[in-house]
């Protein structure tokens, strides 16, 4: 049931999800920080699996950087949009395969088929069932070559609770709030797809328990998390200050506090 709701939600999002990561300076923090750390850890060349790649925003960037990429996603509408933008960006030769499916079953791929796997924008978190999430992690590991990087980003539970306080205080009295607070589980019905909201240490332990080496934890919005209006105002009105803030963000985003409060955070891992 949860998977059907996730598919329905993202089929309805359409071009909105394509625009999400570049809508404004605040949203670009997630996108640009993810790219920064991928550049840091990806091999110089190779084949990358974009698991839960949606409309292809990351895949296209990787294609432009010279990587070969396979997009794999649950939503047929997202994949339709991905095909369109892959053509528009003229990276068809790099992003040559676009496949529909759930990330907890990557059976269409052989073991150790990829030089890196990325699972960004919280597709793992959209699997509410814990056993299926663990299977998805196992699959991301299975299809990655030994020694290759694995990138996983999710939505942070503390940031979700703060969002409820600031933007949706009426929901605090509803049963959904303590459920998220105590378990991280959200089964839909309040304007967003079903999701498991993570604590940073929870994600780290889950990945390590499945056999990955966690190299870094990264707060993608970091200290700016929850301050969309202020972030966008700084970027728009004070470009010099914004440059300094970006430098500050990169210096602080791997600190435990920044990861903990971030709306999205990413684990940078390596398969032993």
Q: What kind of region is each of these model predictions?
A:
Residues 216-272:
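A C-terminal cap/extension of S-adenosyl-L-methionine-dependent methyltransferases
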Residues 134-146:
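A short glycine-rich, Lys/Arg-flanked "PGG" loop and its adjoining helix->strand segment in the class I
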Residues 1-54, 57, 61, 149-179:
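Conserved class I S-adenosyl-L-methionine
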Residues 127, 187-202:
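Acceptor-substrate binding/catalytic loop of class I
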Residues 57-105:
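Class I SAM-dependent methyltransferase SAM/SAH-binding core
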Residues 107-116:
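A short acidic, Gly/Pro-enriched loop at the edge of an enzyme's catalytic core
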